A protein has these predicted regions:
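Short, contiguous alpha-helical
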Residues: 2-33, 38-87, 124-158
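Acidic/histidine-rich alpha-helical segments that form the ligand environment
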Residues: 86-124, 134-139
């Protein structure tokens, strides 16, 4: 009987905890977004600073790009215009906010599915500058980094 790949199990654990929790460090990304309404999602602490909504789109974009790297599939594209920091929708209402939250969740689930389907040997394969494993750990820590920003923005907004 083949041994389960411990690295992939640990990676999925980190990936899941950074997005949904529970995590010893506190709130995961999805938890930090709980209860955010449109006005709060659009609020900026200053000119040229990102708002929560932009952080959500940025996180979704990079989940998509990491999936593209892992799958080596140039057909994997983000469904919104712009790269790195996709533009906000033209209408920034509650329905659009809900759609973009769903986009973040969908990109997370698609990336998770891609990680689950990877052969253990694929973890050491290059996916751009970094290995598959480094890309996947990187996106989990990317979530945590932006979770901290979102929590800070929420405190400043109040």
């Amino acid at each position: 009987m083949p041994r389960p790949d411990r690295r992939r199990a640990l990676l999925l654990d980190l990936f899941d905890r950074s997005f949904r929790g529970p995590a010893w460090h506190g709130t995961p990304l999805w938890g930090a977004l709980r209860g955010v309404r449109v006005a709060e999602a659009l609020w900026r602490p200053g000119r040229g600073r990102h708002c929560i909504w932009e952080l959500v789109l940025h996180a979704a974009y990079w989940k998509c790009m990491v999936r593209r790297r892992l799958l080596r599939d140039p057909a994997v594209t983000f469904p919104r215009p712009g790269s790195d920091w996709p533009r906000l929708p033209e209408r920034t209402d509650a329905a659009a906010w809900k759609r973009d939250l769903a986009l973040l969740e969908r990109e997370h689930l698609l990336l998770r599915r891609a990680i689950v389907r990877l052969a253990p040997a694929a973890l050491d394969r290059r996916a751009g500058r970094w290995t598959v494993l480094q890309n996947a750990y990187g996106i989990a820590t990317h979530d945590l980094y932006h979770t901290g920003q979102i929590q800070l923005l929420r405190r400043l907004y109040r």
